[in-house]
Amino acid sequence: MSKAVVFGSFVVDLMARSPHLPVPGETVKGSYFKMGPGGKGFNQCVAAHKAGADVVMVTKLGKDTFGKVATDTMDSLNMPKEHLLFSDTEDTGIALILVDENTAQNEIIIVPCALNTIT
């Protein structure tokens, strides 16, 4: 079995679709919302795990609801959690993702939070 260590981000994705992306100052009514686990590092870790690799994730989470999303997701996939780091002062990172449902164009804002404190 292949072995891998992924040192990267876990964020909770907050994704909304709308008929078009807002221009500055505009409010747009959305048509769909989904919240779920994400982050480039976490997505790579899950892909390697599902491909059969013995993989561990090194990332930093907050001790908050979104940190629980990370640990619950890893539990559901039977992924090890012993290398997760936790911040006492910062929240788990998030990604705000806006998607135009007609063109699939997106705009993403990443708020790293606890990820900024990895040392």
List where the protein language model places each region.
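Glycine-rich phosphate/adenosyl-contacting loop at the front of the ribokinase-like
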Residues: 1-60, 67-69
